[in-house]
Amino acid sequence: MELTTRTLPARKHIALVAHDHCKQMLMSWVERHQPLLEQHVLYATGTTGNLISRATSMNVNAMLSGPMGGDQQVGALISEGKIDVLIFFWDPLNAVPHDPDVKALLRLATVWNIPVATNVATADFIIQSPHFNDAVDILIPDYQRYLADRLK
């Protein structure tokens, strides 16, 4: 696959997702980093987004709840280049009915090469990165070339 460059803006579009057993962990992380997160555009799956808004008064673009299609909505935003960072505290010890959606979301984040945190330690590394508030170039698939090759 040919690659091209995408510039993540200084003001990031950040998706926040958490499974039920991890919501409190994400809430604590968000509250701890609220001054930094307020400088960015936030998205979240439905329940998580509403909980964050209620607890912090931050503006969060809430999708549907994860099991109702919210994970897929976030994945679509990633594939459209509208999400720059994914913070996804998923529960590795409990299966969820929408496991295929979870796998698809993580796959899309990997395909489009955006930073992903699946636990507090990694989320802390990302938000404390010297690049977090800077524009950063990343390599992504060159979809136009991909499509042109497929249509030959």
UniProtKB/Swiss-Prot annotation:
Q: Which GO terms describe its biological process?
A: methylglyoxal biosynthetic process
**Segments forming domain MGS-like:** 6-152
Q: Which GO terms describe its cellular component?
A: cytosol
Q: Which SUPFAM superfamilies match?
A: Methylglyoxal synthase-like
Q: Does the keyword Lyase apply?
A: yes
Molecular function GO terms recorded: methylglyoxal synthase activity
Summarize where substrate binds, as residue positions: 19, 23, 45-48, 65-66, 98
Enzyme Commission no:
4.2.3.3
What reaction gets catalysed by this protein?
Answer: dihydroxyacetone phosphate = methylglyoxal + phosphate
Q: What does this protein do?
A: Catalyzes the formation of methylglyoxal from dihydroxyacetone phosphate.
In which family does this protein belong, per the annotation?
Answer: Belongs to the methylglyoxal synthase family.
Q: PANTHER family of this UniProt entry?
A: METHYLGLYOXAL SYNTHASE
Kindly provide the name given to this protein in its UniProt entry: Methylglyoxal synthase
Q: What are the leading ranks of the lineage?
A: Bacteria, Pseudomonadati, Pseudomonadota, Gammaproteobacteria, Enterobacterales
State which gene encodes it.
mgsA
